[in-house]
A protein has these predicted regions:
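Low-complexity, intrinsically disordered short peptide segments enriched in small/polar/basic residues
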Residues: 14, 37-39, 53, 76-79
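Short alpha-helical functional segments enriched in proximate histidine and acidic residues
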Residues: 62
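Catalytic zinc-binding patch centered on the HExxH motif and its immediate surroundings
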Residues: 1-39
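Short pre-active-site segment immediately N-terminal to the catalytic Zn-binding motif
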Residues: 34-54, 65
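Walker B catalytic acidic pair
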Residues: 58
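Alpha-helical, largely C-terminal catalytic domains
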Residues: 20-23, 44, 72
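Post-HExxH zinc-binding segment in Zn-dependent metallohydrolases
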Residues: 66-88
Length: 88
């Protein structure tokens, strides 16, 4: 069953964050603010630090759509590592 949350990002953009089953082995997807319904989908089977890393990674795609995948992967890992060590 999907778990939905709505957030305002980039000041005034309404984003849906949905935890749901994803097909094809993906852990997350970000559908840009250029779509009618900007949203982030996160695989609902993720737990712990891996889940946090994917959430941060997908949020970085939403906030910085022109950033490279390499940048969002490394920044996502680094931010998640700090948050995890601080018990968030």
């Amino acid at each position: 069953m999907a778990e939905d949350h709505t957030f305002t990002l980039n000041g005034d953009e309404r984003w849906l964050v949905r935890f749901t089953t994803l097909e094809g082995g993906a852990y997350g997807y970000t559908y840009s603010q250029k779509s009618k319904r900007p949203r982030i989908l996160i695989h609902d089977g993720l737990r712990g630090r891996h889940r946090l890393t994917i959430i941060v990674h997908e949020l970085l795609h939403a906030l910085y759509p022109s950033a490279s995948v390499e940048h969002t992967e490394q920044a996502g890992k680094d931010i998640a590592k700090v948050l995890w060590c601080l018990s968030y």
